[in-house]
C-alpha cells in the first residue's frame, strides 16, 4: 500500500447483541467459523441473525487497517472456478460456509451454482472475504456503492463507508471510484473488506486516458482488468451488451444513456464506428476472469434513467445480448449475474424479471432499485425501495442500494446507512413474500417482543437498534419506560396492545382462555338473556320506565 491512510472506523458490537460464531466442518478437515449476530433477549433466550459486519463487531478481534483482515480457511486456488467445481459435484469450503450461513443444505448451494442460478463471488486473491451466495433460492442480498469522485472524498472516508455499510447489512460493496488514487483506494478497501467487492473496470481505464473515451483500447482495458483481478476484485461490471447498432435506439429517450459505463462505450463505438471491444473480445475476457474466479456482472449500459424510458427497445435489445454473453461466459466456466434497471413504474417491473430469466438462463438478477417514480429527489432511497421490494418478490437475487443523495451528490456516511437500511427492508420484504424458509422468524420474534412491551428486545431485533431506541427515548427517556405498557403515541389508556392484554388477562382470570370455555360462556350468557326475556312476558317491546 503506497498511500499513508489513517481511517477512523466504527467497531464494537451492535446494541443488544454480540458477535458469535458457529463452527462447521468443511472439506479436507477444515473447521469453518461462520459469523452471526447474537441478540440477547430479556427472556433469557438468544436469537441469531445473519451478519455481514466481519471482525469489526468482534471485541476480541485485533483491527489493523494497514495490515488488513486475516485470510479465510479452506481457500483453494488451483481447482478452477466455483462454477466448474460445482458442475464436477464438489462441495467447496465456500459452499459449506454458505450453507451454514443461509440455513440451507450444502448440496442445494452446489446445485444452484452448477445450474448458473446462483453465484459465489470469491476471487482467489480476496481471502479476507467471508463467502456468500447470490441467487433467488437464497436470501435477497444488498449491495452498497461507495467510492470517491473527481470532486470529493478520500481513501480514509471510503474505507470508513465500507466498514459502516457492512455493519448495517451490506452483503457486497462496489468501489466506483472515479477520482484520484483509484488503485490505492481499492487496495485499502479489498484488504479490509469482509464482503465481496465489485468494480467497473472501465472507470479506471478511462482515468488512464485522462477521461477521453475515444482513446480507450482493448489492450488498455484488458490490462486494467488483470490489475484488478490480481488485487482481488470479486465481481466486475462489464458493459459488453452496448452495441453500436443499439445506440440509435436511445435517441428519442427522455434521459438518453444514463449509465456511466454505457455512455463511455457508446461514445467509443460512435467515435470509431466499430463494434464495442468489450463485445468483440469477450471470450478473452472470460479466460482472464476464469483464472481468478472473478464473477461477471454483465452491465445494463442502456438501462432506463426515467419512467418514460422504461422497458423500451434499447433496454431489451441489450438484455438479449446479455443472454448471448451469459452462455459464452458459462461455457468458459465463469460465473455470471445480470444487472437490471433503473427507473420502472410498478406495473412494468415484473416483466423485467421474467424476460431476464428467459433470455439469460435464470442467471441471478442484480438490479438498481428500480425507482418507481422520478419526482422525489432527496428521497430516492424510498422511491427505489418500493420498486426493489416488488422486484425482489419477483425473483431478483441482489438489490443495489440507492441513497438519499442519488441524482444530487456523493453520499456521505449517513446516506450510506440510510440506503442500506432502506434496502434491507426491501430485501426482507421480498424474502417474506417469496416464502423464504427463515424470513418470518425475525418478524415473529420482534412482534412478540412488541406485544409483551419488551422495548429493549424490540430495539435489539430491529434493523437499526440505535435509531429505534433514539426515537423511543425522545419522549420517554426514563429507564422505567423500557418496561411500560405504552409509548408516547397512544399513552397508557389508548394502547391497543395493552387493552388486548387486559382482555386476555380478564379471560384467563374467569376461565375463558380456551375455545371450549368461551363457547360455554356464550351459551350461558344467551340462556341468561333468554330467561330474562321470558320473565318480562316474552314481549319484544317494553314500556319506557322513568
Swiss-Prot record:
Record-linked InterPro entries: ThiC, ThiC-associated_dom, ThiC/Bza_core_dom, ThiC/BzaA/B
Catalytic activity: 5-amino-1-(5-phospho-beta-D-ribosyl)imidazole + S-adenosyl-L-methionine = 4-amino-2-methyl-5-(phosphooxymethyl)pyrimidine + CO + 5'-deoxyadenosine + formate + L-methionine + 3 H(+)
Keywords assigned: 4Fe-4S, Iron, Iron-sulfur, Lyase, Metal-binding, S-adenosyl-L-methionine, Thiamine biosynthesis, Zinc
Pathway: Cofactor biosynthesis; thiamine diphosphate biosynthesis
Family recorded in the similarity comment: Belongs to the ThiC family.
HAMAP family named in the record: ThiC
Protein name: Phosphomethylpyrimidine synthase
Species for this entry: Mycobacterium marinum (strain ATCC BAA-535 / M)
Gene: thiC
